[in-house]
């Protein structure tokens, strides 16, 4: 059972967001499942997005300073691939990729900023 059905964020530039999120989400096993002129959505099954970006050009403040999203990764290799894809496609480093024992003995994550400035993370938190 999932805890959250879906999450949607505003984006000032959907084309730029797609260039970033298409390879980043692919590294975690997701793909783009929905596209129209104002929305792109990612998930596992067509038209059933779990994460979406919506065009919002006029919003001054997008989210609060403490806001961030952590995506579940299937492996440490996927976390590293997420980080590399983010760096290659317009993301900015926010802590790199590796073990983070301050969050737990097996907490392996990558932390980046997306092109809209959101703090995003990929994490696997368990024995490998």
PLM feature spans:
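N-terminal beta-strand motif that seeds the catalytic metal site of vicinal oxygen chelate
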Residues: 1-18, 69, 126-128
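Vicinal oxygen chelate
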Residues: 11-16, 71-115
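Short, contiguous alpha-helical
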Residues: 113-128
């Amino acid at each position: 059972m999932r805890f959250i059905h879906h999450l949607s964020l505003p984006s000032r530039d959907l084309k730029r967001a797609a260039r970033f999120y298409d390879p980043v989400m692919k590294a975690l096993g997701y793909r783009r499942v929905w596209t129209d002129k104002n929305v792109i959505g990612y998930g596992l099954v067509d038209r059933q997005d779990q994460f979406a970006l919506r065009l919002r050009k006029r919003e001054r403040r997008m989210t609060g300073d403490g806001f961030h999203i952590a995506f579940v990764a299937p492996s440490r290799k996927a976390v590293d691939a997420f980080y590399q894809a983010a760096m290659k496609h317009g993301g900015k480093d926010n802590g790199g990729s590796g073990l983070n024992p301050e969050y737990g003995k097996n907490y392996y994550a990558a932390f980046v900023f997306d092109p809209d400035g959101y703090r995003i993370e990929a994490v696997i938190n368990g024995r490998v």
